[in-house]
Amino acid sequence: GVRLVGSEMCIRDRYKKYACLALLCIAVEAVLELMVPMIMADLIDNGVANGDTAYIYTKGLQMAGCAVLALILGIGSARFSALAGQGLGANIRQAEYEKLQSYSFANIDHFRVSSLVTRLTSDVTNIQNSVSTGMRPFGRSPVMLIFASSVAFTINRTLAFVFFVALPILAVLLIIIIMNVRPLYGRMQNAIDLVNRSIQENLTAIRVVKAYVRGDYEVAKFEEVNANLKKESEKAFGIAVLNMPAMQFVMYGTIISILFIGGHLINAGQLKIGELTSFLSYVLLILNSLMMMSNVFLMMTRSLASASRIVEVLDEKIDITDEQAEDISVKKGSIEFDHVWFKYKKEAKEYVLSDVSFNIEAGQTIGIIGQTGSAKTTLVSLIPRLYDATKGTVRIDGIDVKKYPMRHLRDAIAVVLQKNTLFSGSLLSNLYWGNENASMEEINEACHIACVDEFLDRLPQGYDTDMGQGGVNVSGGQKQRICIARAILKKPKVLILDDSTSAVDTATEAKIREGLAKKLPDMTKIVIAQRISSVKHADQIIILDRGKVAAIGTHETLLANNRIYQEIYESQKEGVDL
């Protein structure tokens, strides 16, 4: 496996194999390249100097053979490095995406969506590129350094010491550059987050932007974050680009020193021309490798900044797990809230829900009503464990919801949220989200209950009509009815309608209510609504007021005895048949 700054990342065996093959090719290629100067020195000192043509041809063929083999191995190493890098990138993305699927709403609230997108794309690409392009110099440099240094000492120790003086200078320059550029890379990735957020928000709310004629404002807002990204990028790369000139300055200084000292040694008869040529070849190989290695360290510095952001996603502690789960499933659908308290963050001072207690029998229809901000949606979110209660217990069929495996629990509960979501694709494919094995008979039945059949014939291609991105090809009321049909297809024990008929006229809403009561009498139904007409026929109505249960009763009882219900009723009754 691969360890990514503390988080275990698994690489499939074939990618491990590619990485090993790449390193093997790189090492052998480096050895072959290092043999060429040795052969060349021998050719000059023994072949050319003595005028031995046969010897020159033999050594020339040896050099050509080394060059061809090095070329083949170089191509192989590039291929295997790319496969290893792409494989690692794919696995990191997969690991991140799978982790995100296990996030609770509370976990998701810790990140912005745009930031998560960046961590799945740009940050992974940085790591991927550092592996794909960095493996070659990273593998070559140690081999080159050890082998060439040994040969350099063998050729001439005096010149070798000149070369080794340059190494600490190169190291110090690289450390200074890395220390300055590393925090800037982190800021640059955060700036990319802001750009992605601006784009995402604009495209998601493009209709609102058009309706309010705020295009110029959005352009100005984007210009600001784009300029910030440009500024942060210029800072980071402005320091990073100093790497190459600094390395070249040291390299050329080293070469000049070697030529100067080598010339004196040749004049003194202590060094041959072929040996100096060979020595310079090794020095150039080593220094070029070290320059490439410095670029690898810069890439790694950027990839480490990205890796730390990815690790934040992978190391996020999932607060809703199956630790207490047993092998059980929901049988009936009765619900009990037992002194439940809830707040979104542990450090928050005030509770969103305070000491909530009530019972719902299996098959009952329960209405929940209250002013905006009274925590109605939060209340029902605790039933399928989208959030967990801070204190108290939520039970289904008398069993704590934490005892149910989450998959079984959520399979038994269907939620039609306030913000209805349809996916790109046909109407039929969206309905299959509720039950991928549903028959057409079951689909027709669900559509009849949800009154989808009333507009189905008017759709251009019926069930095959494309919904468009987010369901833009149907109206708000039609979208709500499709979402209700999708929930019915799930055949849940508990159906939660969270203000999901707000865009439907009262006559159609009444038909849906009657259809649910007649066709699905054993299903527990919880209806959150703003309109009293939506809940007046419920077996019990729960009134929430600032996160507390203000009253529970039937429409008649509450109308007679509860002030909050009376006020809501009075505010809605004018011109409406309640």
Model-derived regions, located:
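Short intracellular "coupling" helices and adjacent cytoplasmic loop segments at the cytosolic face
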Residues: 50-51, 86, 94-118, 122-124, ...
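Hydrophobic alpha-helical transmembrane segments of ABC transporter permease domains
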Residues: 24, 32, 36, 73, ...
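Hydrophobic beta-strand positions within the nucleotide-binding domains of ABC ATPases
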Residues: 9-10, 120, 293, 416, ...
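Helix-loop-helix
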Residues: 52-58, 151-165, 235-309, 313-314
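An intracellular "coupling" helix at the cytosolic face of ABC transporter transmembrane type-1 domains
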Residues: 16-17, 102-106, 122-131, 135, ...
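ABC-type nucleotide-binding domain
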Residues: 328-578
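Transmembrane helix-loop-helix hairpins at lipid-water interfaces of multipass membrane proteins
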Residues: 19-76, 80, 153-158, 269-273
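Single conserved hydrophobic/aromatic residue that forms the stacking wall/gate
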Residues: 1-6, 11
